[in-house]
Amino acid sequence: MAKYFGTDGVRGVANKELTPELAFKLGRYGGYVLAHNEGEKHPKVLVGRDTRVSGEMLESALIAGLISIGAEVMRLGVISTPGVAYLTREMEADLGVMISASHNPVPDNGIKFFGSDGFKLSDDQEQEIEHLLDQDNPDLPRPVGEDIVHYSDYFEGAQKYISYLKSTVDVDLAGMKIALDGAHGSTSSLAPFLFGDLEADTVTIGCNPNGYNINQEVGSTHPESLAKVVVESECDFGLAFDGDGDRLIAIDEKGNIVDGDQIMFIIGQAMSKNQELNNNMIVSTVMSNLGFYKALENEGIQSNKTKVGDRYVVEEMRRGNYNLGGEQSGHIVLMDYNTTGDGLLTGVQLASIIKMTGKSLSQLTSQMKKYPQSLVNVRVTDKYRVEENIDVQEIMTKVEVEMNGEGRILVRPSGTEPLVRVMVEAATDEDAQRYANTIAEVVQDKMGLDN
């Protein structure tokens, strides 16, 4: 069976790998699996997209596929991924679909599905869609005549989502000057409206999409652009979103980057003090910084680690009924309010904490000391054998003894490439780089492609 779904939906180069033909089939078969086979004759489906030039092409094909199976489609236009997830639940739709490749460059695009509960698909649901794609089954329902349903536009959905985000905080942001970076993507209009409605004074970059400039030297993957603006414009802080609005990276008033670990710590600390943190637990991935875990320990907050990927964070949060989790990359999940990472929601919550505490962002982050981190990738013949390689395990043990508790080692196979990733955190940059290179040399010697 072909594998279409990755860790975050179906992705590829638009019109080459992710073609209109494939988008049509994803609409048809995805609509059947996730809505039509629930017994609904005309399942209600919401469709949103980011600002990529290929979005309208794929949107048209996807909607045609959905209508061909009998779906009633509401087109949301340009909106964030978490906006689609929220509206799918709020409007009691049977299915939500987002067309986006998130932080990827403009040639890429993707299609991801949300169930009626607002959560991404299970592995079983993805496999069922893939099975139908392989079969290309001609026997699925094909409504005709009066059974074919019109699609409609519901661009007001974005304002409904903004109104909801405003309702999640009890303070306005009057007197605060905030720099916003929309990555020329889904939040380009949403972010200025949201923070403007909350009475903040805003300075914006990355909010002029033209279909071709999404994520181009702006957004959460290029926070240095916003850092410069924050300092030059004397802002209180800055918020950088990614192309589809499910990530947030912040900038403090001094121009320092504040990553997902630091944001989780600040929000988790506030929630814990207000007795709002379920089981006093934060869910993160194995890539979170050692300083994050030490800071949580100092606050008496527990932590739980998952594999890399926000879907694994969400799975663990649902399993344990936890309400805060996320990744260093800026995917922050606040389960009390939404079912997926939400950059705008996270930004509003962070701004609210800054306003209520009266502390600057640099003061709030100072309570978490980040350990310098070094990452080395090694191309290998069989990445999955790294955990059983005796020489690699021995050098890891030796380095751990030398670090004496002031560091951390993570050696793991890449999820997408024939690589072993060696990550070391240590007390200094020099130590982190030296230890990472030492381990990587052994991985290369014993497992590398050249050997």
Swiss-Prot record:
Record-linked InterPro entries: A-D-PHexomutase_a/b/a-I, A-D-PHexomutase_a/b/a-I/II/III, A-D-PHexomutase_a/b/a-II, A-D-PHexomutase_a/b/a-III, A-D-PHexomutase_C, A-D-PHexomutase_C_sf, A-D-PHexomutase_CS, Alpha-D-phosphohexomutase_SF
Active site per UniProt: 102 (phosphoserine intermediate)
Gene3D superfamilies: Alpha-D-Glucose-1,6-Bisphosphate, subunit A, domain 3, Alpha-D-phosphohexomutase, C-terminal domain
Reactions catalysed according to its record: alpha-D-glucosamine 1-phosphate = D-glucosamine 6-phosphate
GO molecular function, one term: phosphoglucosamine mutase activity
Post-translational modification: Activated by phosphorylation.
Cofactor notes: Binds 1 Mg(2+) ion per subunit.
CDD domains found in the cross-reference section: GlmM
GO terms, biological process: carbohydrate metabolic process; peptidoglycan biosynthetic process; UDP-N-acetylglucosamine biosynthetic process
Binding site for Mg(2+): 102, 242, 244, 246
Named cofactor requirement(s): Mg(2+)
Superkingdom of the organism of origin: Bacteria
SUPFAM superfamilies membership: Phosphoglucomutase, C-terminal domain, Phosphoglucomutase, first 3 domains
Modified residues (Phosphoserine): 102
Keywords: Isomerase, Magnesium, Metal-binding, Phosphoprotein
Family: Belongs to the phosphohexose mutase family.
Name of this chain's protein: Phosphoglucosamine mutase
Species whose genome carries this gene: Staphylococcus saprophyticus subsp. saprophyticus (strain ATCC 15305 / DSM 20229 / NCIMB 8711 / NCTC 7292 / S-41)
Gene encoding the protein: glmM
